[in-house]
Amino acid sequence: MSNTEAITIEAILARDNMCRAFAAVKRNKGAPGVDAKTIEQTAEHLRRHWVTIRDELLAGRYQPGAVRAVEIPKPQGGTRRLGIPNVQDRLIQQAMNQVLTAALDSSMSEHSYGFRPNRSAHDAVEAARRYVKQGKKWVVDIDLKQFFDQVNHDRLMSMLSRKIADKRVLALIGRYLRAPMRQANGQQQKRRRGTPQGGPLSPLLANLYLDPLDRELARRGIAFVRYADDVALFTSSERAARRQLDSVKGWLREQLDLDTNDEKSGTGRCGESQLLGFCIHETGDVSIAGKALLRLKERVREFWDARQSLTTRQLQAQWQRFVGGWWNYFSHANLQKDLHTLSGWIRRHMRKCFWQRWHDRAGRYNALRRLGVKGRGLKVAGCRRGAWAMSTHVVVNQALKTATLNRFGLTLPWVLAGRM
């Protein structure tokens, strides 16, 4: 059986595939869609009505629900619009994604790293590092303007029709692409373009839409990496970089009906650009990009803002999740220069937060005593200096030293690195 023939509605609805899809949706959690049903409520609904839903899918009559529009802040500023499907539609999309990925992933470009099995952002950065080590030290950054909102439905469906023989699957994908977007004010917006982020099927459709770009760049012999809509080309000279930027921009407009963001697209030496939060230097060393460090500092300030309504225990749990995820991602960079200084800055914000949370002289006195401060050191509880200034006081510093913070579960990045 060919890969094209393997993609059928029966394969998508197979019991084992649906069970794996439900486990994935449950594991990913996520907010309810327009119908406001949770995963548990949807599971109960499916127990009662799955036979009818399955029959509609098999007959090609199933109609997806509207998607809920959600605006989230982008790290570099502005907002990104997500389209959150109902849990039931997330389940069906996930089942489709599993079958389509199994059949089509092997035919995709080796230069594509985003949202694919056994590939990661770290693999993309490592490939880019190899290009730089080979002497390709000029980078072409291509930023696709509102890519997920601008995918041309007709072109995408034409591409899919060459890969999927089952008309029911094609029709279902088309309905998901056209599912209306429900705004916060209740108005519904028809969709004629785009595959909004938020559903399990969107990343795969995005990769399929950009696969012709991968093939064109490979045909030209260009060194490049692509992670979803982040595209970076590597050349040996500034002249070649500028030529490729102009050429690829024109090709994208003509062949894929996509525009580039001129403010964010451009050329430069490798150390001047960033890729997926990392900066690759001419020596081949990898460091954290400046913007990524700024985002970390913003997040730290948010975490340790004393005005948060979270309890200390809740802060601890969230901090452990955050710093663990941050470290797992950025530990691949060379952090020796920044890590110790950065950790000291983080610890100062922690001390500031606790000083504010102790509220007044009595609260600070009792807290310092519990932390082992004795005698004259306890007089600091009555100090009238501001919290940021007090965060460097020798008594507060000793009371909330690294070992104490570790004991409270407030691990620092340099501790994770084994640099006690």
Label every PLM stretch briefly.
Residues 264-273, 319-322, 339-347, 362-371:
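A glycine-rich phosphate-binding loop feature that marks nucleotide/adenosyl-phosphate handling sites
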Residues 178, 253-326:
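A conserved non-catalytic segment of reverse transcriptases
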Residues 88, 92-95, 129, 157:
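Duplex nucleic acid-engaging cores and interfaces of nucleic-acid transaction enzymes
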Residues 1-47:
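Non-catalytic, polymerase-adjacent accessory regions of viral genome-replication enzymes
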Residues 49, 56-71, 75, 110-272:
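Conserved polymerase palm-domain catalytic core
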Residues 13, 64-70, 75, 177, ...:
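Core structural elements
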Residues 349, 354, 358-420:
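Extended C-terminal regions of large enzymes
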Residues 190-195, 285, 301-315, 325-338, ...:
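Short, solvent-exposed helix-loop connector elements
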